[in-house]
């Protein structure tokens, strides 16, 4: 299996950037398009477990658009072959001492790259160094 083929990695990096822009600017239509429209799609959030695209879309529609700006760090995108990828990142929001973590599983579907599973969590600021425990 080919890992991080340059063209595939560039595609996933671009769609990840599109997702991030849509998230912080609350472009719900773009977010909806980037999630696989299936009952099998899962998004585990900080305070919610969303099973299926209907639950994910309802959450996005009801969420406040305030306070969405964030700064990303330690983003790792890995592609596996032509049609599967993971995107992991840490994030911080102004005024919140906690570190957010986001994991996404992307699959190339007929409609293009879409998230089929996602997880978001917050942790207290880690005491270890940023490089400790990270893959090279």
What is the predicted role of each segment?
Residues 19, 31-32, 40, 52, ...:
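Hydrophobic pocket/interface hotspot
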Residues 37, 80-81, 109:
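Structural motif
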Residues 86, 99-130:
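Short beta-strand edge/turn micro-motifs at domain boundaries
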Residues 41, 50, 122-124:
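Flexible, glycine-rich phosphate/dinucleotide-binding loops
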Residues 35-36, 91-93, 119-122:
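Short beta-strand segments enriched in hydrophobic/aromatic residues
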Residues 4, 8-11, 43-46, 54-99:
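Surface-exposed, charged secondary-structure patches
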Residues 1-34, 38, 126-136:
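Short, low-complexity N-terminal intrinsically disordered segments enriched in polar/charged residues
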Residues 15, 27-30, 59-60, 73, ...:
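Hydrophobic alpha-helical segments typical of transmembrane helices
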